[in-house]
């Protein structure tokens, strides 16, 4: 409870913010604006009352002093605090004070006609803008970012499950509708990509085995001369081949031995075995050791 001093005005009132009643106190000194400082849920609120009748306290008596009618309210908080709009002000001794619910603007003090003979407090220079009201240098992020919808069938493809075209419609000649077109297109592209990746890996392995480079110079010459064409013509077995490729290698590429040496069957190689002799400890070494 603020102790009233000589030539000062004090007011105790009850504010209603939302569903909670708040008991607040204010102190008006001479030559100052009438402001109410209250604490609500740990938040400091500084506001200017729209209209209030105050009582002047002197050592011997208390009498009605003035009735001020500022036109607007001022709400100020620290950064991160929420703004609370007071719905209703009620004086302890009776009577209600209404709010303007208006925009933020400097307070304007005008004397009430009944108290024209009383000199209202002089206005003080407006306080500089608080950090909460000052423009921020960093761009603010929107509270709700629009979530983009994924294309039909993409989530099923990314999950690593077996590829399958849409099961709707049921009959063979019924036209597709809705997202069936895009779903089947994405599944077809994923199946062709997996089969093509497997063919490309096999072709690259065969091309490397024809004449494997042994130096950086050989590697550079090999890369300039290498040309691989991939043909995907699995027909109605496209999904079956794509799913089989996925089971063999999750990334869709041909499986390679852990040691890095992938020995192909003799019939599939176009070089003489003497040019590329496998390591002595190779498991697939079938050369005559006698």
Curated annotation (Swiss-Prot):
Post-translational modification: Highly phosphorylated in the host cell. Packaging is selective for underphosphorylated forms.
Species name: Equine herpesvirus 4 (strain 1942) (EHV-4)
Alphabetized Pfam families for the sequence: Herpes_UL49_2 (PF04823)
Tagged with keyword Transferase: no
Signal peptide: none
Protein name per Swiss-Prot or TrEMBL: Tegument protein VP22
Primary role: Tegument protein that plays different roles during the time course of infection. Participates in both the accumulation of viral mRNAs and viral protein translation at late time of infection. Modulates the RNase activity of the virion host shutoff protein UL41 probably to ensure necessary levels of key cellular mRNAs and proteins. Plays a role in microtubule reorganization that occurs after viral infection by stabilizing microtubule network.
Chain residue ranges for the region called Disordered: 98-156
Biased composition (Polar residues): 98-112
């Amino acid at each position: 409870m603020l102790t009233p001093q000589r030539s000062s005005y004090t007011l105790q009132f009850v504010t209603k913010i939302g569903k909670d009643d708040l008991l607040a106190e204010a102190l008006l000194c001479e030559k100052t604006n009438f402001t109410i400082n209250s604490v609500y849920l740990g938040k400091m609120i500084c506001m200017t009352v729209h209209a209030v009748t105050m009582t002047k306290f002197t050592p011997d008596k208390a009498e009605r002093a003035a009735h001020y009618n500022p036109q607007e309210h001022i709400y100020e908080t620290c950064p991160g605090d929420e703004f609370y709009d007071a719905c209703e002000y009620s004086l302890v001794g009776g009577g209600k004070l209404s709010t303007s619910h208006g925009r933020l603007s400097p307070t304007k003090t005008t004397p009430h006609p009944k108290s024209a003979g009383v000199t209202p407090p002089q206005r003080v220079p407006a306080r500089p803008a608080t950090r909460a009201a000052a423009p921020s240098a960093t761009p603010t992020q929107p509270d709700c970012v629009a979530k983009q919808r994924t294309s039909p069938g993409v989530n099923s493809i990314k999950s690593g499950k077996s590829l399958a075209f849409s099961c709707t419609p049921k009959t063979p000649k019924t036209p597709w509708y809705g997202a069936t077109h895009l779903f089947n297109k994405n599944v077809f592209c994923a199946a062709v990509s997996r089969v093509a990746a497997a063919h490309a890996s096999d072709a690259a392995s065969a091309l490397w085995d024809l004449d494997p480079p042994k130096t950086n110079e050989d590697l550079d010459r090999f890369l300039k001369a290498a040309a691989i064409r991939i043909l995907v013509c699995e027909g109605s077995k496209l999904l079956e081949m794509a799913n089989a490729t996925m089971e063999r290698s999750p990334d869709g590429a041909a499986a390679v031995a852990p040691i890095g040496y992938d020995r192909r069957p003799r019939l599939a190689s176009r070089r003489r075995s003497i040019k590329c002799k496998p390591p002595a400890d190779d498991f697939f070494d079938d050369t005559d050791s006698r």
